[in-house]
Amino acid sequence: MITVERVDTTSKKDVERFVGIPFKLYAECPQWVPPLRADIRTMLNRDKHPFYEHSDADFFIARRDGEEVGRIGALENRRFNAYHDSHQAQFYLFECIHDHEVARALFNRVFEWARARGLNEVVGPKGFSPFDGYGIQVEGFEHRQMMMMMNYNYAFYPDLVEGLGFEKEVDFISTYIKLADFEVPERIHRVAERVKKRRNLTVHSFGSKLELRRWKGRIGAAYNRTFVDNWEYYPLTENEIDFAFSDLVLAANPKLIKVVLREGNIVGFILGFPDVSRGLQRANGSLLPLGLLHILLDMRRTKWISLNGVGIVPEFQGLGGNALLYSEMAKTVKGDLGFVHAELTQVAESAVQMRRDLINLGAKPYKNHRVYIRKI
């Protein structure tokens, strides 16, 4: 018998059960990268996560004959819905054994939850902010997950949701670059230099995390200007920017963060992160007693870099701004930190020009995450 129970997010026991489910399901999976358990606990904590200042969520666990066999989160992002004039519920943190009835039971609870709030469609996986990663993986299962910047799931997951009537909404493509073979043509560097001179642009790199923190407000404002046309966009609150920026600084090597400036205002940025997936696997969800050490060691040793956040404000797109981004991106990934591999993490398929440019520069699509939608 399958039962689905709502998680009491004030109960430590309930929360730990919800958090622990993927650690059981993926215990023998070498591609899966465990999240920090504390991060998932925060997502369930209405007093700590800024999402709950404007929106709501509930969480459910499926049991069969008493055994935990799946979980799911149901979210109503009221700020997103107001911006897009939509009535969407989101699903997130979905995990399930290979069983259609368990998946159906979980999603039926999400559908009931959404209808009770007057919502008419369910979209996901889609998390608490644009920085949580998107989609169910549909291609590239042989490749390791890129830290917490995306989801990893077994190959049967698409069949579970499609069997419930979900259809594709949008794909997010991650591309791979072997840096030994990656060369940005000299003409792009020349265009970048001309654009900098003609439009009075400068590129600023950071020397420390303290300096990076001082730029928090300007970087947040630039985000809210840059991605206004993106499918997933909604204007982040100041507290959401603070929350996301704290995580960014923890994971960042300041040398890999660059901003493009015009008269002191940020008009573009490149966010690069050392891939510490191996360290996260060794930490197995906990920073103590040795998890933090594993992550810090991996930050120094890793041969992989993730570029997750490459953008320029709309008024500079198509005016040589992209050439400047690609020129600076090449300098970043081929710098003196010894990277061998790079991933451009989760570029929406709707960013047609950027995806075409990246492929022309030698990037190869190698992972695909699909966001699904269903009317209810």
Residue ranges: model-predicted function:
Residues 1, 177-180, 373-376:
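Short beta-strand-to-coil "C-cap" segments at the C-terminal boundary of structured domains/repeats
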